[in-house]
A protein has these predicted regions:
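Local cysteine-cluster metal-coordination motifs and their immediate loop/turn environment
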Residues: 92-102, 371-391
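Radical SAM/AdoMet-radical enzyme domain recognition
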Residues: 119-137, 146-273
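Flexible glycine/acidic-rich beta-alpha junction loops that bind and position SAM and/or redox cofactors
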Residues: 204-209, 267-286, 308-315, 338-345
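Short Fe-S-cluster ligation motifs
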Residues: 121-141, 401-439
Length: 439
């Protein structure tokens, strides 16, 4: 037997905290057990502890090739029964954030003709035996601008067709939440929609960035009202993304107070640095970041930082069962770039099929995100899978230079501890048949 290659360790108050990134498991052992395993003295470990270590993937048999097993998982994901359809109902937006990379198109929306094309495309997907669910992700622009008039009727029409096939649709919405009004919430509840809602920090900072003539007193309170209205109305799920820079964390206590009463299973916090900013050289941002993470965990909020998590792909957009369809019928393969002719990869036709630009499609299809030497060596590979295909297309052979670990603003020991505490809180909220092991 041998230690899993994908073990990470950090000291903790009870001994050594183990994190296996392959199986996404955690354990705490005493220091003596840790030393015995590092020296290969498995016969000196108690049978109970050894069984727990093996059962959770921290120790594997000598002939196990974990990397090869991972690669098999990577390619299996491409045959999933879920199809991910990102729909851009509009590239217009009712706020203008200085950091937004998109080129907004005022007044753009889904015409009746384009709605028919999307419906036929969804029909064609649902007619396939290997597709059981279409996951609609509404993106933009601001996808809620014409929701009641155009988007909701289209989704219900597709949902009704899916029912005739004993299939289903799921709906998630990436929104600034300023268009979520009380009359729309019952529609969202009927669709069981989930959300990513973005704020730019505390009230004053958010209002200085997300400005709208319609909301003269600012949009922050509008967003907070929408969060409460949604979570009070139905069993919604909200990923509250907080965009931050070097000043944001100094004033975030007010945000904590504003969401303190939200049911914990209905909300998760995600921290994302504004991509045009960099951490300060004196590491004060990392200190504030760590303190905020710990404060949120103490209050039993689930939280994510950096795009690591056990999955079988680098980016959802990399999967074969994925497409991005714009309001005008143009088709893309990435939501992290502006929706222009440069990045367009196809067009939706009247019969509900896609005419692809085959040279672009084939170039993307040949890329594996996991096989850069730096990624092969990395113990976080099962949680990352390397740069996404879009970045590899733009920056070939740059995986090590562009590794997300280079942007991590807390230490690896702090990161492992945060992940453990976050998992503990998740299991406390939702329950789990395999509790965290303390040995």
């Amino acid at each position: 037997m041998k230690s899993s290659y994908y073990n990470l360790y950090t000291p903790c108050n009870a001994g050594i905290l183990w994190f296996n990134t392959y199986h996404d498991n955690y354990m705490v052992t005493n220091c003596q057990t840790y030393d015995l395993i590092q020296n290969g003295k498995y016969d000196k470990i108690s049978a109970t502890t050894l069984k727990a270590l093996q059962g959770n993937g921290f120790i594997v048999e000598n002939d196990v090739d974990e990397y090869s097993n991972l690669i098999q998982e990577y390619h299996k994901t491409e045959s999933s029964g879920t199809f991910n359809l990102t729909l851009l109902p509009s590239l217009d937006c009712n706020v203008r954030c200085w950091y937004c990379f998109e080129k907004h198109i005022v007044g753009s929306h889904l015409s009746c003709q384009q709605q028919d094309k999307v419906f036929r495309y969804a029909q064609n997907l649902l007619n396939r035996e290997n597709i059981s669910v279409i996951h609609f992700s509404l993106f933009g622009g601001e996808p809620m601008l014409y929701f009641k008039e155009e988007v909701a009727p289209l989704l219900f029409k597709i949902k009704d067709y899916a029912k005739t096939m004993n299939k289903d649709i799921k709906v998630s919405i990436v929104t600034n939440a300023t268009c979520i009004t009380e009359d729309i919430i019952p529609i969202l509840a009927e669709l069981n929609a989930t959300f990513q809602i973005t704020i730019d920090g505390y009230r004053e900072k958010h209002n200085s960035i997300k400005k709208s003539p319609k909301f003269k007193e600012g949009t922050y309170d509008v967003v907070m009202k929408a969060i409460h209205d949604l979570t009070n109305a139905y069993d919604s799920r909200i990923n509250l993304r907080i965009n931050f820079d070097n000043q944001t964390f100094k004033h975030l206590n007010s945000v904590i107070n504003d969401i303190q009463d939200v049911e914990r299973k209905k909300i998760r916090i995600h921290l994302e640095r504004v991509w045009q900013t960099t951490a300060s050289d004196d590491y004060t941002t990392g200190t504030y970041l760590k303190e905020f993470i710990n404060d949120m965990l103490r209050l039993n909020f689930r939280l994510s930082y950096l795009n690591f998590g056990r999955r079988n792909y680098s980016c959802l957009m990399d999967l074969k069962n994925n497409v991005v369809i714009s309001y005008d019928g143009n088709v893309y393969n990435c939501t992290g770039r502006d929706f222009t002719n440069t990045h367009q990869e196809g067009v939706l036709t009247t019969d509900g099929s896609i005419e692809w630009e085959l040279n672009k499609l084939e170039k993307r299809a040949t890329i594996n995100t996991y096989d850069d030497p730096a990624c092969i060596r990395c113990k976080l590979l099962p949680q990352c899978w390397g740069l996404c295909k879009q970045k590899i297309l733009e920056h070939p052979n740059k995986a090590e230079q562009m590794c997300p670990l280079k942007t991590m603003e807390i230490t690896m020991d702090e990161y492992i501890t945060y992940r453990f505490n976050n998992e503990y809180i998740s299991r406390k909220i939702f329950g789990n048949e395999q509790p965290i092991s303390f040995t």
